[in-house]
Amino acid sequence: MCSSDLVTQSAAVKAMIDACLAAFGRIDVLVNNVGGSAAGGPVELSEEAWDGQMNYNLKSVFLACKHVLPVMERHGGGAIVNLASTSGLRWTGSPQVGYAASKAGVMQLSRVVAVQYANKGIRVNTVVPGQLHTPMVEARLAGQRAGGDVDKLLETRVARIPAGFMGDGRDTAHAALFLASDEARFVTGTEIIVDGGMVARCD
């Protein structure tokens, strides 16, 4: 576990990997579960905020992969599960160009690394959560997008989901657990979308 203010620092990420090795002797699974969104399209979003989105959402994944891949290769394999977002696949209700671009980048980074390391026994996949009901939705997003009206935000989000309800963190976790497990031994370079059908919907 690397705290949110350190995930963009190479030395801190390497120290995390080294600490895991010291404690457990090997690393079989890496889950990159980092994310934060900033509102705004290309005009509204500042260059500083754009850079922050790329660093926090994408560079963090790059650094963790960079430092763990040699360890996994040395030990004969492993599984990497990266977390992206449906914002990297489609419009999800608000302009957040930095977040969307960085999460799309996570998916493509995963595909490239998956192909490069497939013959070394290392699998790399992405879980793509949709609009879930998490504490962050009520604590932060409602203030950003619905003037603090939690019920209004939830109603808007549910309306986009064909399943008619929002999942939660357990749904994301179950997908990640599958991809990290031996049951997914022939699965690499792909995504599991956990969104109640939202991405498949065309309107």
Each model region followed by its residue ranges:
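Substrate-binding pocket helix/loop in short-chain dehydrogenase/reductase
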Residues: 41-54, 157
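Alpha-helical segment proximal to the catalytic Tyr-Lys
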Residues: 70, 115-116, 185
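Residue(s) in the substrate-gating loop at a strand-loop-helix junction
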Residues: 85
